[in-house]
Swiss-Prot record:
E.C. numbers: 2.5.1.147
NCBIfam families reported in the protein's UniProt record: CofH family radical SAM protein, F420_cofH, PRK07360.1
Reaction(s) catalysed by this chain's protein: 5-amino-6-(D-ribitylamino)uracil + L-tyrosine + S-adenosyl-L-methionine = 5-amino-5-(4-hydroxybenzyl)-6-(D-ribitylimino)-5,6-dihydrouracil + 2-iminoacetate + 5'-deoxyadenosine + L-methionine + H(+)
Alphabetic keyword roster: 4Fe-4S, Iron, Iron-sulfur, Metal-binding, S-adenosyl-L-methionine, Transferase
First-level EC class: transferase
Cofactor: [4Fe-4S] cluster
Function according to Swiss-Prot or TrEMBL: Catalyzes the radical-mediated synthesis of 5-amino-5-(4-hydroxybenzyl)-6-(D-ribitylimino)-5,6-dihydrouracil from 5-amino-6-(D-ribitylamino)uracil and L-tyrosine.
Residues the entry annotates as binding [4Fe-4S] cluster: C70, C74, C77
Keyword Metal-binding: yes
Ranges of residues in domain Radical SAM core: 56-298
Name of the molecule in the record: 5-amino-6-(D-ribitylamino)uracil--L-tyrosine 4-hydroxyphenyl transferase
Organism the protein comes from: Gloeobacter violaceus (strain ATCC 29082 / PCC 7421)
Length: 389
């Protein structure tokens, strides 16, 4: 069959190191035959072994979603609330500090922090940016050594728009205050027709790209992500991967690729009906992980599944499909869990290592930037120790 010849030719070219095209990636993503998918899996697994070996990394971190009050209305989001709506919350700085202290006491090396978009944090005559700088200081003043992985491109763009500041100014001030890296979320699918249906109030593809590249120029590394398994096609996914690879070749600022399969149990009825399922399809997610590994090649070597969305067993299976990282402990998670995910909100380092062992690989602890670390705690400042007594 012609398609089998094309499949072998595409995989052979990837194995030889030729850069995969967007149409080739779409072709692989469209494979439904189990035998064809196994060929893709095997090719991705071989490339993973060649690029990063047999060891699998994990990070001890805590996720803090500091507020769910948000002015935007993304069609898939069950997390956001209006300010006066039941269930709306905004953590005060003392609560955020408490969560950080608990994480540090548990050996965390990273705090990941994101929240809703709330113009009311501006205060009387102040800047929205000032609130975010205070958030950063609440963590970094007592814990200067903790790695702060905070604020998506959408959050940075929101601050710049509200305060009428250049995005470069916002990013520079956040970095100077203590933000060490950023989550590359709010990407969803970087294809405008899809974005207009899925999240029309979010920043555009072009604005996302410009914000990300500005962050990289500012010295802020970032994860890269894709929200898959909703209204997009195989070609849309491939186009998205192409946008990410183009950025990576220009800046080298992405640390990893994380696939975020759509969870829609609590999504609006119209979107649920259109997608036709509420939980991720594991086989589809695994194929996408494998194609991403082949597509990025040497330009982006760290690949992570989402155990929150796939469950730890599914994430462990992804280690056979090109992934070399099992993710973080998180300690808590609200955005995906409120959407109806069944993967849980917290994992212990022991559970992550066990999942890696189950996949017949060796686990090691890393930091946010994929440097191996020894298990250690970050000691709080003396003032915090005194306050805790």
């Amino acid at each position: 069959m012609r398609d089998w010849k094309r499949l072998h030719a595409t995989l052979d070219a990837a194995r030889e190191g030729r850069e995969m095209t967007v149409p080739e990636a779409a072709f692989l993503l469209g494979q439904t035959d189990p035998a064809a998918r196994e060929l893709v899996r095997s090719a991705a697994d071989r490339l993973r072994a060649e690029l990063v070996g047999e060891r699998v990394s994990y990070v001890i971190n805590r996720n803090i979603n500091f507020s769910n009050i948000c002015v935007q209305h993304c069609s898939f989001c069950a997390f956001r609330r209006d300010a006066q709506e039941a269930g709306a919350y905004s953590l005060d700085f003392a609560h955020i500090l408490q969560k950080t202290a608990e994480a540090v006491a548990s050996g965390a090396t990273e705090i990941c922090m994101q929240g809703g978009l709330n113009p009311a944090v501006r205060g009387a005559g102040g800047r929205v940016l000032d609130y975010y700088l205070q958030l950063v200081d609440a963590i970094k003043a007592p814990f200067p050594r903790i790695h702060l992985h905070a604020f998506s491109p959408q959050e940075s763009f929101f601050i710049a728009r509200e305060d009428r500041l250049p995005i470069e100014t916002v990013l520079a001030e956040l970095r100077a205050a203590g933000v060490d890296s950023m989550p590359g979320t709010a990407a969803e699918v970087l294809h405008e027709p899809v974005r207009r249906r899925l999240c029309p109030e979010k920043l555009s593809t072009l604005a996302w790209v410009r914000t990300v590249e500005a962050a990289h120029r500012t010295g802020l590394p970032m994860t890269s992500t894709m929200l898959s398994g909703h209204i997009e096609t195989a070609m849309h996914r491939a186009i998205h991967l192409g946008v990410l690879r183009t950025i990576q070749k220009r800046t080298g600022g992405f640390t990893e690729f994380v696939l975020l399969p759509y969870v829609g149990l609590a999504a609006p009825r119209a979107l649920r009906a259109r997608v036709g399922r509420d939980q991720p399809e594991l086989a589809d997610a695994l194929l996408t992980q494998a194609v991403a590994r082949l597509f990025f090649g040497r330009s982006l070597v760290n690949h992570q599944p989402s155990w929150v969305k796939l469950g730890l067993e599914g994430a462990g299976e992804a280690l056979r499909w090109g992934c070399n990282d099992i993710g973080g402990t998180l300690m808590e998670e609200h955005i995906t869990s409120m959407a109806g995910a069944r993967g849980g909100t917290c994992q212990t380092p022991e559970a992550l290592r066990a999942a890696v062992f189950q996949a017949e690989r060796t686990a090691y602890q890393r930091d946010t930037l994929y440097q191996e670390v020894a298990a250690e705690s970050i000691q709080p400042a003396a003032s915090l120790k005194s306050a805790a007594r």
